[in-house]
Amino acid sequence: TRETYEAVTRRAGSWRAFTRGLDLLLDAGIKVRLKAMALRSNAHELDEISSFCRERTKDFYRFDPLLHLRFDGDPVRNEEIKAERLSPEEIVAIERADRTRFEALQNECEKGELVCPELEHQSCDHLFQCGAGVESFSVGYDGTFRLCSSLWHPGTTYDLRAGTLREAWEEWVPHVRDLRGAGAGFLERCRRCALVNLCLWCPAHAALETGAMDEWTEYFCDVAHARAAALLPDDMTP
């Protein structure tokens, strides 16, 4: 509804502007793909949001219940974000309620794409086990080069105004991807967790939550284990 949409955007008239813009795109024959964030402020309307989006999307719609904190570390805004986060149990409940999403997650678990038991024997201490900087990167409006759009931690970005794209890609990316973790949270938990793909944890998000790229994050961990308990047979749940 307009009320819920504008409670999230905090801008009067934004619902009308959004629907007008979307209608213009659709009327022009432009295919769109829609995504929504699942927040405490809109969780009561997720069914309606899903119906609205699926009627208009070119192929699929998804919602994301995992909120990371702000890149600038603003403490007031970060508390507002935390207040909008759903509990692990609420996240599982809304995923169960969306049959298409839940079945897709189950299928991916069965194929071994979301749960990786082999990681439990991981000995590598490289921080970046993800695809950041492997086939893509991000460049901000100010010329800041990042391995991914969420990676803002000091010492991981490159100023293209003071160097070249070739240097960033061929020299800086390998340097950042070679960084090692020394924190106990990373070494004893996250790097050896089979549920990493059910979790929001990564070096970039850990830095936003804790200030360190190799720290464990309780909320992410609780969500991952709650999702695993819902998706996996009892004998497969870590």
Spans of features found by a protein language model:
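Flexible mid-to-C-terminal extensions adjoining Fe-S/redox cofactors in radical SAM and related proteins
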Residues: D125-L127, T144-F145, S150-P238
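Radical SAM enzyme [4Fe-4S]-AdoMet core and its adjacent flexible, acidic
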Residues: T1-D142, R146, S150-L160
